[in-house]
């Protein structure tokens, strides 16, 4: 399966308006994963922080997905807001990992500015409040199974911007 370069990072890192593979989709018959707890990203979404986000340069206020869970063949609307503690300059990176079951589909480092520019944001990203509303098309042919996605974002100086993860399982429609 070929992964587009919009939905996944947009879903995982929408406050930074990033974009990447659409692997976080599940069927409507599923029960959303339990994501309660201290590391839950606020809002209607499956996102969790990788660790305590208090030292991150990006403080995410909220991420809402519609529909949640995302549905194959339907547009996914992402609304997100957050505050950056300082300007995010060129040279910032995203380490993206996507696994499908036990198979690692993606393990690559990407330039953050290249990704933000794909969705209409200028780089460097200014210090202060950021608001994003983005719609991405979800392909109808999403293989059933368990997807685990991790996006670790760092500044050019190596400071943590954010680190997010999501686990989504969807089943074959019967």
From Swiss-Prot:
Subunit structure: Monomer.
A Pfam family of this chain: E1_DerP2_DerF2
Any one Gene Ontology molecular-function term assigned to this protein's record: sterol binding
Taxonomic source organism: Arthroderma benhamiae (strain ATCC MYA-4681 / CBS 112371) (Trichophyton mentagrophytes)
Chief location: cytoplasm
Record SUPFAM superfamilies: E set domains (SSF81296)
Its biological purpose: Catalyzes the intermembrane transfer of phosphatidylglycerol and phosphatidylinositol.
UniProt GO cellular component terms: cytoplasmic vesicle; extracellular region; Golgi apparatus
Keywords of the record: Cytoplasm, Cytoplasmic vesicle, Golgi apparatus, Lipid transport, Secreted, Signal, Transport
Propiece span(s): 20-36
Signal peptide region: 1-19
Protein name: Phosphatidylglycerol/phosphatidylinositol transfer protein
Gene Ontology process terms (BP): intracellular sterol transport
Location(s), subcellular: Cytoplasm; Cytoplasmic vesicle; Golgi apparatus; Secreted
Family listed: Belongs to the NPC2 family.
Domain of life: Eukaryota
